[in-house]
Amino acid sequence: MTNSNSITPVMQQYVTLKQQYKEYLLFYRLGDFYELFFDDAIKTSKILNIVLTKKGNVPMCGVPFHSSETYLNKLVKLGYKIAICEQLETSEEARKRGYKSLVKRDVVRIVTPGTIVEDSLLEAKESNYLACIVRIKDSCAIAWLELSTGLFCYHMTHISKLDSDLLRIGPKELLVADDLLEIEAVYSIIKKYRFSITQYSSSFFDENRAYNTLCNVYGVSTLKGLGDLKGVEISVCGSLLEYVIATQKGSLPKLGFPKAYVQSDFMFIDAAALRNLELFSTQSGELEGSLIASIDFTVTASGGRLLKRCLSAPLASADAINRRLSAVEFFVNNQNLYKSVRQVLRGIADIERILTRVKIARCSPKDLYSLKLTLEKTYELVELLCKFNIDIISEFCSRLGRYEDLICILNNSLLQNSVSSVKDGGFINPECDAQLSEYIYIQECSNQLIQELRDRYRNITNIQSLKILYNNILGYYVEVSSNHLIDDKNFIHRQSLANNVRYTTTELKELESKIISAKDASISLEIKIFGQLCSDVIKYADKITITAHAIAEIDMLTSFAELAVQYSYSKPIIDDSYEFNIKKGKHPVVERNGKFITNDINLSSEQRVHLITGPNMAGKSTFLRQNALIGILAHIGSFVPAEYAHIGVIDKVFSRVGASDNIVCGYSTFMVEMIETAAVINQATERSFVILDEIGRGTGTYDGLSIAWSVIEQIHNVNKSRAIFATHYHELSKLDKYLKHIKCFCMKVEEWDGKVVFLHEIIPGASDKSYGIHVAKLAGFPQSVVNRAEYLMDKLKTNEDLLT
């Protein structure tokens, strides 16, 4: 930056503020633009591809205030943090303090990836979490908050499970202590997922400091009556809130006390399974082709977010799962009803996020109007649902609530064409306030009032060419030609030109004052009325939150019904047994590509481990993933892609299917494989579901076979989990001779006329061929290479010397 003694007062004000917010891009409000200067300008102009200019030696660029959210969106998505500096008064107000007084400006909030609430900056069906981690020995406390909805949770976890927890939560921004990043295991996870990181010294996470923050936020002197927070949990929740308060400059919505995420209530899906099963994105990072893209039929933003939360943490209670399944079954059996419900839901706004914007005084008239329309829509939902005397449906009706008084207030006060900003007015119904009606009348009738005054002056002066005109210098004025001078003391001379003379009158000045001030006064009054409307909405906040959650749940359940009807899914039997019996199961994503071969599986207590052999390309990996996905779908309360499914509650899902070199962490393919397998054998229980594909393939034959053999023994004898193990080691098929609960299966293959046909069908028994050369041929190997491979294979079978 330049010498502060040689810059203008405005730039001095900027420099002073920038010193306080060095780590942020400073959006400095100047009139209708946000301006950036010095290094901020150079960096931002490149990122946003906007013009970089100079004023003297100062680099600068700017974005229009009215379209600033578009630019903020791009910066936030790239992980930048922006300090928003606004004008706190008008230039007229500043001049009242002195002719050369500078307009007061200050930073009113800090926009970071994890603290945004504006619809234009948020993905409708994506949660936008800010998370915080505090470590104690080998454990971590995690807290996560979605400011746009108020969802606030915390959880204790072991460092070994941090990868899975962070992948499940998916925070947009992560708040950590500097020394936490010095732990290699933590640093590698954070670097791998490229979270936006905000670092503080360890003192920021002090427990006493956090305790005081929590007490201040919730207005209590002790936390004893609010929950079971203790020790490091206090640190993580309080520190997260302190950061939010700092970014919002104290404008914090009323938040519920943080809720403990109890792992035993939910299925644990480890990080490898979340990735390998492609629940939320494919291996290449695309949404298309993922499980959620295939099953998401939700029509509201909140329903979409709920579905994603449920998929990342499926239920682990048979009663809770069956409650959802019963609701889905009800809708499947009443298709006209659920289709009508979904039609109503399509017209419903994201009132969960609207309510937060109301609470922090950052909502628009359009938000309130959308809220009103949605509350009206809830009556339509109740009317559709209340005809059915079923417990879960009756519960939905009670949660949807009634809002006659609030709807009446909003209806009487808001115009239908409510705008997105309060600054220009024009959104409050003039009929709701007599003073506002007068201001609007003056504005709307200003031309008529001026014309009436002009006609009267023409009659008084007998000058029919007399005009009343307006410019920015004189305001309104009377103009006549130089040939028609006015000899009347009520007409005060203002200006003489070559051909015209201009006058004013006391009456004209008063009318001008009314016209000009009426606009400002009406906007001020509209803003005041709008503030009262927001206060009225906040009185219903708790009730609206309950309604919003009910809407999301109804949307998700009717979405499951639509999925079941469209693709002929069946209702699974869920209980506390150890069954996993699927008949004619299908992969919920792959089946959409066309003809799909169904398969059965029965992982009963008598044969809880299935060993599958067969060639690559025969469908082993698809079969493994398919059954894990069927289990997960059942646990979120969805029907499943199978003719029949009986599944005992699963507590954890582990997947070791496919691997790629984890270059970011410096791990080889084989190391990744071993780490993921270690997670399985260290954490799986008899209620877990495990799929393992080609364990040991990344090392020598004997090493790999030995590792695979011992892993199967461990899962069979110690973990006792339900497991499917696919392998190319045909020697492992001997294990069913001495391991009591293993059964061998293989992929059915037919050979005909020298050709191999993969039937993608699972049959009992073991495969004695891998058909690797045939797969190479299908992949496009030159015939000469294929022939040579066949020749060498024949030699190997007879133990001949390959070099002779």
From Swiss-Prot:
GO terms for molecular function: ATP binding; ATP-dependent DNA damage sensor activity; damaged DNA binding; mismatched DNA binding. GO terms for biological process: mismatch repair. Transmembrane segments: none annotated. The keyword Isomerase does not apply. CDD domains: ABC_MutS1. ATP binds at G614, P615, N616, M617, A618, G619, K620, S621. PANTHER family: DNA MISMATCH REPAIR PROTEIN MSH1, MITOCHONDRIAL, DNA MISMATCH REPAIR PROTEIN MUTS FAMILY MEMBER. NCBIfam families: mutS1, PRK05399.1. Belongs to the DNA mismatch repair MutS family. This protein is involved in the repair of mismatches in DNA. It is possible that it carries out the mismatch recognition step. This protein has a weak ATPase activity. This is DNA mismatch repair protein MutS.
